[in-house]
Amino acid sequence: MKRHVLLAGIAAMMLTACNQKTETTLTLSGLDPVKFQTTVNDAQTQLYTLKNKAGMEVCITNFGGRIVSIMVPDKNGVMQDVVLGFDSIADYINIPSDFGASIGRYANRINQGKIVLDGDTIQLPQNNFGHCLHGGPKGWQYQVYSANPIDSTTLELTRISPDGDENFPGNVTAKVLFKLTDDNAIDIKYSATTDQKTVINMTNHSYFNLSGDPSKAATDHILYINADNYTPVDSTFMTTGDIISVKETPMDFTTPKSVAQDINRTDFEQIKNGNGYDHNWVLNTKGDLSQVAAKLTSPISGITLEVYTNEPGIQVYTCLFYTSPSP
């Protein structure tokens, strides 16, 4: 396993079906496409590779719509893999994780696993401290998406979710479009249609370590979040419904600082509740894709990740509850 650790972010990538050859051709990140070929619930899994003119490479598997690797140049021009991922489909199947996944139907937590639609209360799986997390234990991150490689930089994944899937109402057809641009941006677009009133909240769940060295903690990374407010959580990581200013708290990243600077401030209740950072920030961008929502930089590699989104919030998770299995 590649042990690249830190923070959930959102980005985009590029593609070429790289596992339909008789001979084994490794990806730039050293992945063997053959190790991603299997059948899950009668559906075929594959590894797809996107590559742009600048030499950036992104590998994606249609199992869970997962980003497996992102290869980008560091300040010296050396290519580095900056996300956490496994080296085979067997590990993704046998070791429960959300690494790089396209989460659905509903990312993050639903309080006590209950939704109310047209006055009717619907009970969903309670798979995390009594709440429904990431669509339940059989969320889309554990299902096989159908794949449509559009060109060498674009991959479209589709998931058809039947009515009653994890007790969510409505037949849903969801699409995730990955586009790798020549300026080393990964554009991810989500869309979904349904025949009933329901709830949908999709995201990408990649973990970044921009140093390119999995033996180094990513807490030395410098983080900026374009947000004056955040939503606090209780001891079960459920949002309380409040919106609170970040000013003069460890939650303030309006001035860039290292993730490590306040991550051990257990005298601050929110750091204690989240065992670090596992919170949503209310973005100042208000859906403006021309404004950066967050920025993360490794002082070692010089690699910078910028996040742009039309959503109202961004979740930052420092992965302090995950214990990496042996490779």
Task: List PLM regions with ranges.
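Active-site loop/turn microenvironments that scaffold catalytic and metal-binding pockets
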Residues: V78-W140, I222-L223, M238-S245, P250-F253
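C-terminal motif of bacterial Sec signal peptides marking the signal peptidase cleavage site
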Residues: T16-A17
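Sec-dependent N-terminal signal peptides
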Residues: V5-M13
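Active-site/ligand-binding surface loops and adjacent short beta/alpha elements
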Residues: P214-P299
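Conserved small/polar residues in nucleotide/adenosyl-binding loops
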Residues: Y322-P327
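Beta-strand-rich N-terminal accessory domains
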Residues: Q37-Q80, F86, Q112-I122
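Extended, loop-rich substrate-binding clefts of extracytoplasmic carbohydrate-active enzymes
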Residues: L26-G30, V34-Q44, K51, T121, ...
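Acidic, contiguous internal or C-terminal segments within carbohydrate-active enzymes
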Residues: K51-N52, M56-N62, I160-S215
